[in-house]
């Protein structure tokens, strides 16, 4: 076995100290006895200016070469330390002579700028996440509460794929005899889509406030005018479904603006769910305005209408198969309960939802609790 003095001689005579002295990084070599075999010029200069650094380096020798610290004799270690107000990346590697552990070489690199940048990025990211959580709370708070509004009992589930969502639904009281309900899905996710949902809520309320006698088709045409005036990216669009309930004759007049998730109506008398279908184009500033066809439906006591967005039917199982419209219709026909339906979708889904999932159920014929 090689002796310690021979190892120290090897360390002092076999390294290219010219290269190490040319480095801006601090470098020192410690033999297996804990003696300093070499310190490069950059570290010598730093030691002359800092007692704190001297103390740290002395303490570090004892830590590195303690009997319990066997890992330093076999493995390269990298850690970050704050020394004299600066951040350093410290790389410690074992040195071997004739197969035996001879000592360690330490390289201290100043990474203060990088560390400050990482801290700034972390804080900025934290602020952004806090802002997104705030927006999400606002989004959730502007949705109708799960309660009864006149003859309409509403229950909803709002589950964004990200912190904020591009889905929205709302109930608007037009007058004592009529209420409007809409659901919309803005293209994309995140902050941009969530801001668009705010635009939709404000715009829809303003339209009904100014034009209470508008039909669903007229509302969509007016909404499109407001949207095109924004002069935003031509790739931005949204889909929506709008219905106006008239409690005087128990009728529902509805129109569709490209919403590819037609609501499902479940009638107690028929014990099966069916689609509320009507054609219409999505609202976009690159697609010409549509006339938006309307249909009228006679409602019965205890009818249930399920509203949803495409994240619901696009949930996938482990084989990549989508939940789909027909499965949703069948499950809604069997269950008729929004919580049970939501659980069925979650059980079917194999991974994190790729899109926002929004469900809203209206039961017709409840008592007024307002």
Predicted regions and their residues:
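Conserved acidic
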Residues: 1, 110, 185, 310, ...
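Sensory coupling linkers of modular signal transduction proteins
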Residues: 2-10, 95-126, 313
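Sensory modules in modular signal-transduction proteins
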Residues: 6-41
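N-terminal capping loop/helix in small sensory signaling domains highlighted by a polar->aromatic N-x2-3-F motif
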Residues: 31, 39-50, 258, 309
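PAS/PAS-like sensory domain cap-loop motif
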Residues: 43-55, 194, 209, 317-322
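Terminal output helix/cap of sensory domains in signal transduction proteins
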Residues: 52-84, 341-347
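C-terminal catalytic subdomain
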Residues: 76, 298-307, 312-370
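… and, occasionally, acidic/histidine-rich disordered N-termini of signaling adaptors
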Residues: 83, 87, 120-306, 352-369
């Amino acid at each position: 076995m090689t002796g310690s003095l021979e190892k120290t001689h090897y360390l002092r005579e076999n390294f290219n100290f010219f290269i190490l002295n040319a480095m801006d990084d601090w470098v020192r070599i410690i033999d297996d006895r804990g003696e300093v075999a070499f310190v490069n010029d950059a570290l010598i200069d730093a030691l002359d200016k800092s007692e704190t650094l001297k103390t740290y380096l002395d303490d570090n020798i004892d830590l590195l070469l303690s009997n319990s610290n066997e890992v330093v004799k076999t493995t390269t270690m990298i850690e970050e330390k704050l020394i004299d107000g600066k951040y350093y990346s410290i790389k410690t590697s074992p040195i071997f002579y004739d197969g035996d552990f001879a000592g360690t070489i330490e390289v201290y690199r100043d990474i203060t700028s990088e560390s400050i940048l990482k801290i700034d990025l972390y804080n900025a990211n934290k602020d952004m996440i806090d802002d997104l959580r705030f927006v999400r709370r606002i989004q959730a708070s502007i949705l109708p509460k799960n309660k009864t509004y006149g003859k309409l009992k509403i229950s909803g589930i709002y589950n964004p794929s990200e912190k904020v969502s591009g889905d929205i639904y709302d109930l608007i009281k037009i007058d004592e005899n009529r209420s409007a309900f809409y659901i919309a899905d803005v293209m994309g996710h995140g902050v941009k889509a969530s801001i668009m949902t705010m635009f939709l809520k404000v715009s829809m309320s303003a339209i009904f406030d100014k034009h209470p006698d508008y039909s669903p088709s007229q509302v969509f045409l007016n909404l499109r005018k407001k949207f095109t005036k924004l002069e935003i990216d031509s790739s931005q669009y949204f889909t929506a479904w709008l219905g106006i309930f008239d409690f005087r004759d128990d009728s529902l007049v509805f129109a569709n603006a490209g919403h590819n998730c037609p609501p499902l109506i479940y009638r107690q008398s028929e014990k099966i769910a069916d689609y509320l279908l009507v054609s219409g184009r999505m609202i976009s500033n690159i697609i010409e305005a549509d006339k938006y066809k309307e249909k009228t439906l006679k409602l019965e006591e205890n009818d249930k209408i399920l509203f949803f967005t495409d994240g619901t039917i696009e949930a996938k199982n482990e084989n990549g198969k989508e939940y789909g419209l027909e499965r949703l219709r069948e499950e809604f026909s069997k269950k008729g309960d929004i919580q049970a339906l939501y659980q069925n979708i979650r059980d079917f889904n194999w991974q994190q939802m790729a899109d926002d999932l929004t469900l809203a159920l209206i039961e017709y014929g409840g008592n007024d609790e307002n």
